[in-house]
Curated annotation (Swiss-Prot):
Keywords: Alkaloid metabolism, Dioxygenase, Iron, Metal-binding, Oxidoreductase. This is 2-oxoglutarate-dependent dioxygenase phqC. Fe cation binds at residues 227, 229, 287. The lineage of its organism: Eukaryota, Fungi, Dikarya, Ascomycota, Pezizomycotina. The keyword Iron applies. InterPro entries: DIOX_N, IPNS-like_FE2OG_OXY, IPNS-like_sf, Iron_ascorbate_oxido_reductase, Oxoglu/Fe-dep_dioxygenase_dom. 2-oxoglutarate-dependent dioxygenase; part of the gene cluster that mediates the biosynthesis of paraherquamide, a fungal indole alkaloid that belongs to a family of natural products containing a characteristic bicyclo[2.2.2]diazaoctane core. The first steps in the biosynthesis of paraherquamide is the production of the beta-methyl-proline precursor from L-isoleucine. They require oxidation of a terminally hydroxylated L-isoleucine to the corresponding aldehyde by enzymes which have still to be identified. Pfam families: 2OG-FeII_Oxy, DIOX_N. It comes from Penicillium fellutanum. Its EC number is 1.14.11.-.
Length: 353
């Protein structure tokens, strides 16, 4: 039997709390030296702050423009925009609240992400806070156990076909990032990818309706309260409004803006399953969505609607979320017990409703 290689734990210097920007073309088509350099930079950024920005990952500006056209809530071109369709059409594909994988439409306030922090990861008392967010979730086109809930084709022609294609493209891009993380952490090739090749991942379109600043400042409703995602990694595309913030690793409870960049810039954050696999060597990126930076000093007025799209790369349901042996030593014993990814996900998601 081959000997398990221990991963060296590096003490992280946190002088720069913001995510780095890495060019994935170096990993896609670069030399072995360039691939290694990309992987090291990728790991350095997520180790520091739980986040990294990725460019030239294979999803074009034009494709992301088309993606955001489907996310609009304006009624100008209603049959091309999901969030503008009639409420009864959304209710026809509503996501049933509960711990099963999310499929279909969730209304504003349906999910309480703040409850995901009930394990003491934050000191904020937000257990009943609600989200000013509606979203549409789709699973893998090949998922027959939990099939996606699609609006009738006559209601929004082409919506299903586009999102199913975008799901496949996003999954490929996310697996590329995971492959680079394997390399940057000196793990055996495929040890993480092999756990994420199934149909457990999810694609989410987000719409944050226009809202008064005063309402957000009262604290019982937020665009998204502080939380960590439950999967392996999240690949996010955001519009130009801003409001996404990550927690400063050296100052718990303090948050820093993650401003939008180029149209196709992909913001990648480490999620809880990755933290479990690495036995807390790489920890999940805590984040929130709040008032855009340029409006922070205002006490009144309205914040425009915000849109984003997240691809949640998740482990196969039967994959273990226990720490990999490469991250377990006598000095760093396993911090998490054996559990399947599906059981872990359902246990955690049940707290959000």
């Amino acid at each position: 039997m081959s000997k398990t290689t221990e991963v060296k734990v590096v003490e992280v210097q946190l002088e720069d709390p913001l995510p780095g920007i890495v060019d994935a073309s170096r990993f896609i088509s670069g030399s072995p030296t360039e691939q290694r350099a990309f992987a090291v930079e990728l790991v350095d950024s997520v180790r520091r702050c739980g986040f990294v920005k990725v460019i030239n990952h294979g999803l074009s500006d034009e494709l992301i423009d088309e993606l955001f056209a489907w996310c609009q809530s304006s009624h100008v071109v209603q049959n091309e925009r999901f969030f503008a369709i009639d409420p009864e059409q959304k209710l026809a594909v509503v996501n049933p609240p509960g711990p099963s994988p999310q499929r279909g439409w969730s209304c504003v306030g349906a999910e309480k992400a703040s409850r995901l922090f009930s394990r003491g990861q934050t000191s904020l008392d937000l257990t009943d806070a609600r989200r000013n967010q509606e979203h549409f979730d789709a699973g893998s086109p090949s998922d027959t156990k939990w099939p996606s809930r699609w609006p009738d084709e006559a209601v929004i022609p082409g919506f299903k076909a586009f999102l199913e294609d975008f799901y496949v493209r996003s999954h490929q891009a996310a697996l590329l990032i995971l492959e680079a993380l394997e390399m940057g952490l000196n793990l055996p090739a495929g040890v993480l990818k092999s756990r994420c090749g199934g149909c457990a991942s999810e694609l989410r379109l987000n719409n944050y309706p226009e809202i008064d600043i005063e309402e957000l400042r009262r604290g019982k409703i937020s665009r998204i309260h502080p939380h960590a995602d439950l999967g392996v990694i999240t690949c996010l595309f955001q519009d130009g409004l801003g409001g996404l913030e990550l927690e400063h690793r050296s100052h718990a409870g303090s948050f820093l803006p993650v401003p939008p960049g180029a149209r196709s810039e992909m913001v990648v954050n480490i999620s809880e399953t990755f933290q479990l696999w690495t036995n807390n060597v790489i920890t999940a990126g805590i984040h929130q969505v709040t008032v855009p930076p340029e409006m922070k000093t205002r006490t009144e007025g309205r914040i425009s609607a915000r849109r984003s799209c997240a691809f949640f790369l998740k482990a196969n349901g039967d994959a273990s979320v226990a720490p990999l042996p490469q991250f377990v030593t006598q000095e760093r014993p396993a911090a998490y017990s054996e559990m399947t990814a599906l059981d872990y996900h359902q246990k955690r998601l049940a707290t959000a409703y």
